[in-house]
From Swiss-Prot:
This is E3 ubiquitin-protein ligase SspH2. Belongs to the LRR-containing bacterial E3 ligase family. SMART domains: LRR_BAC, LRR_TYP. It comes from the Bacteria. It comes from Salmonella typhimurium (strain LT2 / SGSC1412 / ATCC 700720).
Length: 788
């Protein structure tokens, strides 16, 4: 009986019904062989195994010796443990492959010879296929002469034909997997499994993220419509499947893209060094290409609705399609914008070099254009709800739309405000030149927050605000402002001169302590820290606390010895001097807190665990006080947040043992914090410490650093277990929740279960850490508050 030889092409998947139809149609010999070997495979693998047997017996166009090896290796992979030893390649030489029964009798074999013959022997029947030498694409040879080089391929179809069967796909994928560098082999194996599942299940979504890949195989499943490739190391992509509708590639190393499928609807390429784009499909609706290195864009498709080109190097934009609804182009080098489509609803062009904006469409409801060079704004659409134009050069604003909900105009040159819409919920005019305010401000809702900090408001205006907001029944907005108004600009001294005023003079013959601060003056934010030191000398602590100067001198001595701590402290100084002296004091507290944590992480308390726990307790108490202060701020109508935070810290310094806090502040009387508030806060902090501190310190980063140094083996074992717990939980959630719901490959769903898996693994890690913490810290955790 001759072999049942057809076209050599089978569908991408074969149902059980199709298997039996093939098996009972004149029973070709490979099916007789199948009856003898199907028990080698579990029921879930039998379909794929039969597909592979069929392909071995009917080699498709382009078959190479490597393909034959891959097909027999695939059968070994699919077989039950133990039965894979019955599937051989190279038993009688490198060109002989066979499958044996339980008595070691041959069921099926394939032999290749140097003449280019591919011979299949199966149950007494033999069929030879003629192979050709692939010397050039599309060229066929008639044999393999001795000494010739090249690859034998079957000669039925051109060698460039794409895979048609799962076995053909698997051959290509397996070869790609075996060619992996050592560090990439695990990732490629995982991706091959995903592609097999995608092909066998008919899943239209393929996600191959975070696998450490530098390449992809030459062929991807042809049927997929969504391809997601986040966080690998790809420098290029293979030819894309023709039916693709959505392509998302983030966090790779792509500098260019292949030809895009004509039916592509959504293209998202972000966080790559991409320098240019190919021609875009005419039906493209969504183009997100932010975080690349693009300097220009191609012609945009007429039906494009969303365009995100933020974080590139664009100096201009092409003509915008009439259907465009959303345009995000922040952080580029744009100096102007083209005409905006009439239906545009969202426009984000912040962090550019725009000196003006074009006419705004009537449908626009969101406009973000902060950090540009705008000196004026065009007329605003009546339906605009968000206007974010901070960090420009505006001296005035146009009439504000009645629907406006959010207005951010900080860091401009405004001297006055127009009438404010009654429905406004957020107003930030931080750092402008306002001396007075519109009457409409006090008529805003009680749900509205207003930030007036950094403006030179007149004393008359401040007094009026105090009277209005403190009146019985006041139901207007919450207003934040500077108690002493904005500080006037002042000259910044050289850092070593500012430091010298605080440092102890040198003894005779010794170098001046301030000398080494000469070189620190070249570091980032040194000017800000110099100004901060000068402002410290104007605070209540300098005036009233005789030991304050010595404290600062000691602090500066540590900063001089620690580059990392100095860099963090200098950076914090940039926000410390923008208003009143209490702000300077508050930021000093923040800097001292950073110092405490830094010392713990560096190992200062490795041999003084009591001091480590004491530092942790102080951080816990300060954190609780901050929560209490934030709640208090919400109850005040006219408030300087700094004064509220500082009031709790300053007045509870002694009762809560806050070593990083100073003893004086200037504006406590107008902070809004009462004696009752302070008493309640003290009780709340102490109660919270008693019930929560053991769990809190278990999660404290500096404690982890100490444990890693003192018990590295135990901590490392717990870290490794945390990683394996995460992977196991993620797989379980994927199998039990995503797969049944058809959400495998859905980025949002996978991110959600990833967060749950991470949280579960973290809890297990902390549970494992608890005995070590109890063992090492012991009684230090049992310290109780003394009765007053």
């Amino acid at each position: 009986m001759p072999f049942h030889i057809g076209s050599g092409c089978l569908p991408a998947t074969i149902s059980n019904r199709r298997i039996y139809r093939i098996a009972w149609s004149d029973t070709p010999p490979e099916m007789s062989s199948w009856e003898k070997m199907k028990e080698f495979f579990c029921s879930t693998h039998q379909t794929e195994a039969l597909e592979c047997i069929w392909t071995i017996c009917h080699p498709p166009a382009g078959t190479t010796r490597e393909d034959v090896i891959n097909r027999f290796e695939l059968l070994r992979t699919l077989a039950y443990a133990g039965w894979e030893e019955s599937i051989h390649s190279g038993q009688h030489g490198e060109n002989y492959f066979c499958i044996l029964d339980e008595d070691s009798q041959e069921i099926l074999s394939v032999t290749l010879d140097d003449a280019g013959n591919y011979t299949v022997n199966c149950q007494g029947y033999s069929e030879t296929h003629r192979l050709t030498l692939d010397t050039a694409q599309g060229e066929e040879g008639t044999g393999h002469a001795e000494g010739a080089s090249g690859t034998f391929r079957t000669s039925f179809l051109p060698a460039t034909t794409a895979p048609q069967t799962p076995a053909e796909y698997d051959a290509v994928w397996s070869a790609w997997r075996r060619a992996a560098p050592a560090e990439e082999s695990r990732g490629r194996a995982a991706v091959v499994q995903k592609m097999r599942a995608c092909l066998n299940n008919g899943n239209a979504v393929l996600n191959v993220g975070e696998s450490g890949l530098t390449t992809l195989p030459d062929c991807l499943p042809a049927h997929i419509t969504t391809l997601v490739i986040p966080d690998n190391n790809l420098t290029s992509l293979p030819a894309l499947p023709p039916e693709l509708r959505t392509l998302e590639v983030s966090g790779n190393q792509l500098t260019s893209l292949p030809v895009l499928p004509p039916g592509l609807l959504e293209l998202s390429i972000f966080s790559n060094p991409l320098t240019h784009l190919p021609a875009l499909p005419s039906g493209l609706c969504k183009l997100w290409i932010f975080g690349n290195q693009l300097t220009s864009l191609p012609v945009l498709p007429p039906g494009l609705q969303e365009l995100s080109v933020s974080d590139n190097q664009l100096a201009s934009l092409p003509a915008l399609p009439s259907e465009l609804c959303k345009l995000w182009a922040y952080n580029n080098q744009l100096t102007s914008l083209p005409m905006l489509p009439s239906g545009l609803q969202e426009l984000s062009v912040s962090d550019n070099q725009l000196a003006s904006l074009p006419t705004l469409p009537s449908e626009l409801y969101k406009l973000w254009a902060y950090n540009n060079r705008l000196t004026s704004l065009p007329a605003l659409p009546s339906g605009l709800k968000e206007l974010i134009v901070s960090g420009n050069r505006l001296t005035s604003l146009p009439v504000l739309p009645s629907e406006l909900k959010e207005l951010m105009v900080s860091g401009n040159r405004l001297t006055s405000l127009p009438m404010l819409p009654s429905g406004l919920l957020s107003l930030s005019v931080y750092r402008n030149q306002l001396t007075r305010l519109p009457e409409s401000l006090i008529h805003l809702s009680s749900e509205t927050t207003v930030n007036l900090e950094g403006n030179p408001l007149s004393e008359r205006t401040l007094q009026a605000l105090r009277e209005i907001t403190s009146a019985p029944g006041y139901s207007g907005p919450i207003i934040r402002f500077d108690m002493a108004g904005a500080s006037a600009p002042r000259e910044t001294r050289a850092l070593h001169l500012a430091a010298a005023d605080w440092l102890v003079p040198a003894r005779e013959g010794e170098p001046a302590p301030a000398d080494r601060w000469h070189m620190f003056g070249q570091e980032d934010n040194a000017d800000a820290f110099s100004l901060f030191l000068d402002r410290l000398s104007e605070t209540e602590n300098f005036i009233k606390d005789a030991g304050f100067k010595a404290q600062i001198s000691s602090w500066l001595a540590q900063l001089a010895e620690d580059e990392a701590l100095r860099a963090n402290t200098f950076a914090m100084a940039t926000e410390a001097t923008s208003s009143c002296e209490d702000r300077v004091t508050f930021f000093l507290h923040q800097m001292k807190n950073v110092q405490l944590v830094h010392n713990a992480e560096k190992g200062q308390y490795d041999n003084d665990l009591a001091a480590l726990v004491a530092t942790g307790r102080e951080m816990f108490r300060l954190g609780k006080l901050e929560q209490i202060a934030r709640e208090k701020v919400r109850t005040l109508a006219l408030v300087d947040e700094i004064e509220v935070w500082l009031a709790y810290q300053n007045k509870l310094k002694k009762s809560l043992g806050l070593t990083s806090v100073t003893s004086e502040m200037r504006f406590f009387d107008v902070s809004g914090v009462t004696v009752t508030d302070l008493q309640d806060a003290e009780l709340q902090v102490k109660a919270a410490e008693k019930s929560e501190f053991r769990e809190w310190i278990l999660q404290w980063g500096p404690l982890h650093r100490v444990l890693e140094r003192k018990a590295p083996e135990r901590v490392n074992a717990l870290r490794e277990k945390q990683i394996s717990d995460y992977e196991e939980t993620y797989r379980m959630l994927s199998d039990t929740e995503l797969r049944p719901s058809g959400l495998v490959g859905n980025t949002d769903a996978e991110r959600t279960i990833g967060a749950r898996a991470m949280e579960s693994a973290k809890k297990t890690f902390l549970d494992g850490l608890r005995p070590l913490v109890e063992e090492m810290l012991g009684s230090y955790l049992n310290v109780q508050w003394r009765r007053n």
